[in-house]
Amino acid sequence: MDRFYVISNSMKDPEGKIAKEIKAYLNFRGKQCIIQERQGKESLRSYKYTNANLIPDDTECILVVGGDGTLLQAARDMIERNIPLLGVNKGTLGYLAEVDGDNMEEALDRLIDDNVVIEDRMMLEGCAYSHKKKLLQDFALNDIVIARSGRLQIIDFNIYVNGEFLRSYSADGIIISTPTGSTGYSLSAGGPIVSPEASLILLTPIAPHTLNTRSIVLPADA
C-alpha cells in the first residue's frame, strides 16, 4: 500500500500527536499520507468523524485513531466507500482497534508490504417508521438496539422475518446484532459469540420477561 488517510478522534488524540506520528513514519517510508483536518461542530454535520466525499479516490487504507466507538462510527460514515479501515487504539476499549503505540510501526510496515489480511464485515441498515412514515434511517457495524426509556416499563415485540411472523418477545428491549457486534452488548445480554466473518444476524432480547427466551440466529438476507 502506498496511499493512506488518517481520521483522528479529537477527544482521544486532542493535539493530533498520534496522527502526526503516523504521517511522519509513512512519509519516512516514502508513502503518501493525508491527515483529515479537524472538523466543525458535530451538530452542524451530517457525519461524525469523516466526510467520505473528501477522501481521495486512490486512498488504499484509512487509519482511525481512537477507540472502538470511533472505528464503529467511521465505518458508518464510510458506508459508501470500499476502503479498508484499521483502528489505532487510544480509547478504553481496543477489541476492534487492535493497533496501539507499542506495535504501530510494525503494523504500518505490514500495510506498506501488503502483508495483511483484509476481513469483510457485514453491516446492518435500520429504518424506523411511524404510521407508515419513515422517521430515520442509519447503518451499523455492530448492532441496532430498540430499548425502553423514561417511564416505559416493558415493550411487546412481534418479530417478522421476510414478512413472516417468527415470534413475540416481552422485554426491556431487543438487540439486532452483526457478527462483529456479537461480543458487545449482545453478549452481555446472553447472546452467543460468532465468528466476525460470518454472514448472519443475531436477535437477542434485553431482560426478557420469560425464562426460556434465547437469542435467534438468522441468515444475513433475512
List each model region and its residues.
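Catalytic phosphate-donor-binding core of small-molecule kinases
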Residues: 1-54, 93-175, 183-222
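Short acidic/histidine-rich motifs immediately flanking catalytic phosphotransfer sites
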Residues: 55-63
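Short, well-ordered beta-strand core segments
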Residues: 62, 85, 174-175
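N-terminal glycine-rich "phosphate-gripper" loop used for MgATP/nucleotide binding
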Residues: 64-68, 75-77
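Short glycine-rich, flexible loops that bind phosphorylated cofactors or substrates
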Residues: 70-72, 183
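Gly/Ser-rich helix-loop-strand patches that form or flank binding pockets
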Residues: 73, 78-90, 95
